[in-house]
Amino acid sequence: MIYHLISKSCQRLNKPNLINNLIKSQKQSIIYSSSSSSGSSKFISNKYFTTTSNSNNNSNNTTTTTTTTLRQDEIDFFNQQSSDWWNPEGTMKPLHRMNPFRVKYICDRLKIYNEKVSKNPIHLPLEGLNVIDVGCGVGLLTESLSRLGASKVVGLDAAKNNILMAISHASFDQKLNENIQNKSLNYLESTIENFYNIENDQQFDAVCSLEVIEHVDNPKQFIDYLSKIVKPGGSIFISTINKTFLSYISAILGAEYIFRMVPVGTHHWDQFIKPKDLESYFDSNNCQITDLKGLVYNPLTCEWDFTNDLNVNYLLHAIKK
C-alpha cells in the first residue's frame, strides 16, 4: 500500500487552469552544472553567515550565536543537490510540480488576512508586501514571490551552493535580475538565528518556510525565530511532512526507494513533525494556526493536488497576534 502516492490522486488527472498556469513564467530546463558556481566565491561571506572561503582568507570567520537550528549533515546534502535543483525533470521534479500549489495557497490565505493583498491586482497579488523565504534552496518559491510583485523578497539559506545557484539563475531573467539590482530581491547565506541577531526587527508581512522544518535541528527554536521576524498581524507559512506510519510508507519507502522520485536520504522519519507539535510551538509565540491543508502526490501522473488528509504532506498558515 503506497497510500497517497497512488490511490486518491489517480482520480485527479485534470487540473484547473488557474493552477496549471500559475507561475507560468517559471523557467524550464535551465540546468546548471556544479561548475557554474566556481567563479562566485565573492558571495561566500556576508555579515549574516560566514564560511571558509577557497581564497587565502585567514580572517576570524565565526558565527555569533551559541545555539543553532542548523544541521550540518542536511546542509552538506543539499549543497550536493544544488546543481540539479533547477532541472524540472531532475531530482527535484516533485518540488517543481508542487510550487504552483504552494504559491496559490500563500496568495489565497493572504487575500483573506491581509488588506493590501485583497485590494491588489490579480497579476500582482503581493504588491506592497515584505516577504522572506527561509530555507529558500535555489529560489523556486523565492522567484515566484518576487514575480508576484512583493516590494521586498529575501531568500535565506544556510547552504552556500544553493545561494550561489539562486543568484545565478535569477540573473538569466531580465525582471528578476532588475529586482536583484534594485534590492527588491535579495539572497543571503545565513541561518535564521544569525539573520535575526543582526536584523533584530519584526519586518516581514509574510514569512515562508516550505519543506524546511523537517531538515532543521530544534524545530521549536526554529519556529521561535520565524515568529520574531514577522510583524504583528503578519502571516507564517509552513509546509512539511506529518510524522505518521503512512508518511514513512509514502515519503520515504515510496518516494525514495520505490519510485525514486527524490534522492535516497532526502528525508528522515524521526525529523517529521506532527501538526499538534507545531500548534504548540506557535501558541508559545503568540501565533495562531488559521488553516491546515494536505497535499497529495501521484507518481504516475507526477501531479499534486490539495486534500483534507494531513497524514503525509501538509501546509499551514499561522497569524501572529
Swiss-Prot record:
Organism: Dictyostelium discoideum (Social amoeba)
Localization, UniProt: Mitochondrion inner membrane
Stored Pfam families: Methyltransf_23
Protein name: Ubiquinone biosynthesis O-methyltransferase, mitochondrial
Record-listed Mg(2+) binding positions: E211, E214, H215
Protein family membership: Belongs to the class I-like SAM-binding methyltransferase superfamily. UbiG/COQ3 family.
Membrane topology recorded in Swiss-Prot or TrEMBL: Peripheral membrane protein
Cofactor(s) named in the record: Mg(2+)
Pathway: Cofactor biosynthesis; ubiquinone biosynthesis
